[in-house]
Design a protein with these regions (language model features):
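Basic/polar N-terminal segments that are highly enriched at the extreme N-terminus
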Residues: 1-4, 153
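Pocket-lining segment of extracytoplasmic ligand-binding domains
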Residues: 146-257
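Amphipathic alpha-helical segments that form well-ordered structural scaffolds
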Residues: 122-126, 172, 295-305
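Short, glycine-/small- and polar/acidic-enriched structural segments
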Residues: 7, 14-145
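Conserved small/polar residues in nucleotide/adenosyl-binding loops
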Residues: 307-309
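Secondary-structure end/capping motifs
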Residues: 225, 230-302
Length: 309
């Protein structure tokens, strides 16, 4: 039987490298890999259905799936995960603690970004700051005029306004026109070096470790998707993808354990790996539903309460 010729869009990660360098093969598939930024992947996937297999925003996937119009079926391969305590920046000259954000203005590139759902969940669960307690200002991080990738309705009581058409939320933060900034990327331009701007949490790593110890949650950002018609026509394909992506991740972890030469352009990586395993266990970046059920349930709970379809 000839192999399926399929397009695969994903990020350039150590956990996917064994796939695109050919070390790991997808059974029954002859792939054409495209290494793209999340913004381009998600826009093309949800607007134009450009890819057969694609890394997807977990939040956008759930919005589209709940609306009955998602072209993809998710596979529990979680290509991006991150503690989003580093996703919140504030004017340190007026915000001393998370609770100070009540009544303030927070810039966001998009309301429904997965990173922002997790960040809002941290504010709500740990600090009592609800989405209705602030005014959300939507705009681009480094270019004006960014809009939501997918249509959504905000919950009752949530107020969001657009940034002026000629400015970015980074500029607004730098000038002090907003009090906070929530995004998966850091502020750009002058805001990046402004001494009055900093992380909401003074030590976000320590705060994230405490969060994990209390909740057992390692936030999921992106999931793997396959076009519905392909999965229906070839029911073996999702399992083949899960197997291949799991093998690629295992290859990346094996390389991290090889200390003969540093594989990552970052000092102290061995200590960071040891610390991650001590805190989170040996299989800290697990795939599959069963091992990630608490994380998925927590995200779904906040997603349903924060984003109305």
């Amino acid at each position: 039987m000839p192999k399926l010729q399929l397009s695969v869009a994903m990020g350039d990660y150590d956990r996917t490298r064994a796939l695109f360098d050919g070390t790991v093969q997808i059974d029954g598939v002859e792939p054409t890999y495209m290494l793209l930024s999340p913004e381009e992947m998600f826009f093309r996937a949800f607007r134009f259905r450009d890819f057969d297999i694609c890394e997807l925003s977990l939040s956008s996937y759930l919005v589209k799936h709940a609306g009955g119009n998602c072209p993809y079926i998710a596979i529990p391969v979680f290509l991006s995960r991150a503690f989003r305590h580093t996703a919140m920046y504030v004017r340190k000259d007026r915000i001393r603690r998370p609770e100070d954000l009540k009544g303030k203005r927070i810039g966001v590139p998009e309301y429904q970004l997965t990173a922002n759902v997790w960040a809002r969940s941290i504010l709500a669960d740990d600090h009592g700051v609800q989405p209705q307690d602030v005014t959300w200002v939507r705009g681009g991080i480094d270019q004006p005029g960014r809009a939501e990738k997918i249509e959504l309705k905000l919950p009752d009581g949530v107020v969001m306004v657009n940034a002026p058409a000629d400015t970015t939320i980074s500029d607004l933060l730098d000038r002090g026109d907003i009090d906070g900034f929530m995004a998966p990327r850091a502020p750009s331009g002058a805001a990046r070096s402004n001494p009055a701007i900093g992380w909401l949490f003074d030590d976000p790593t320590a705060t994230a470790k405490d969060y994990y110890r209390r909740t057992g949650i390692f936030p999921i950002m992106h999931v793997l998707g396959v076009r519905k018609e392909l999965a229906e026509r070839h029911p073996w394909l999702p399992a083949a993808l899960f197997k291949a992506f799991s093998l690629a991740k295992a290859a990346a972890l094996d390389k991290l354990d090889d200390t003969s030469a540093t594989k990552v352009t970052l000092p102290f990586v061995e200590e960071q790996l040891r610390a991650a395993r001590q805190t989170m266990g040996p299989d800290y970046w697990s795939y599959g539903v069963a091992d990630n059920l608490p994380t998925l349930e927590a995200f779904t709970r906040h997603h349903l309460s924060l984003v109305h379809i």
